[in-house]
Amino acid sequence: MTLDLTGRVAVVTGASRGIGYFIARELAAAGAHVIAVARTVGGLEELDDQIKAAGGQATLVPLDLVDMAGIDRLGGAIHERWGKLDILVANAGVLGVISPIGHVEAKTFEKVMTINVTSTWRLIRSVDPLLRLSDAGRAIILSSNAAHSARAFWAPYAASKAAVETMMRSWAHETENLPLRVNAADPGPTRTAMRAQAVPGEDPETLPHPSEIAKRIVPLASPDLKETGLIFQAKHNRFVAYRQPE
């Protein structure tokens, strides 16, 4: 079934490249007005060109997500122009370093937590009232299997993704009696710059292109979606529930 997001307003962070770039394009192609947030102006302008060439609409927001006051202002600006928000895709994130935990520098750990966790919370806080005004608010928080695998040398990134998944589930419980649906999306290994940084010896041609992963994730923005508080595994195209340790 074709996804119809005509008249919907969507925010996508980390929209200048990778999975976020293609999610933004898919949302626009489905009819949503995309508010594209990223710190890289050139990437945003390229995205804008692609969206408009396909007949879509976008508003560009050059914003570094370490700018917490800027995130706070974003919600007010959206309310002033559109009066609501229908879709949030919290995609922006950084890897940090793949390193023994005892060798991770404090500034590196703090940057991962600031971008991946604190800015996601500030973003949620900024737009939560607007999503509640929508008749079908949808929030998609990008996560990773690293949140559960606790693999060696991935501690900062893994901890940050475990944190955002926990926030997602808590937020979903808070809003379960509202039209708002809140889920995490685990894209799995994808042909992105972050993956190349994490696993430099891997052949990228063996991985799915971010455009393919975006096509699987975007249906989570559908007004018909019923699921909330779950993790969508793009690799397997399925929802799974978080399992408490036994």
Residue ranges and their predicted role:
Residues 132, 138-163, 168-177, 189:
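Catalytic loop of short-chain dehydrogenase/reductase
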Residues 8, 56-57, 84-85, 131-144, ...:
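Active-site loop of short-chain dehydrogenase/reductase
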Residues 177-178, 184-185, 192, 200-243:
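C-terminal helical subdomain
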Residues 99-101, 105-110:
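Substrate-binding pocket helix/loop in short-chain dehydrogenase/reductase
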Residues 42, 62-73, 106:
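The beta1-alpha1 cofactor-binding region of Rossmann-like NAD(H)/NADP(H)-dependent oxidoreductases
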Residues 30-46:
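Conserved glycine-rich Rossmann-like NAD(P)H-binding loop of the short-chain dehydrogenase/reductase
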Residues 9, 16-17:
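Conserved glycine-rich cofactor-binding loop
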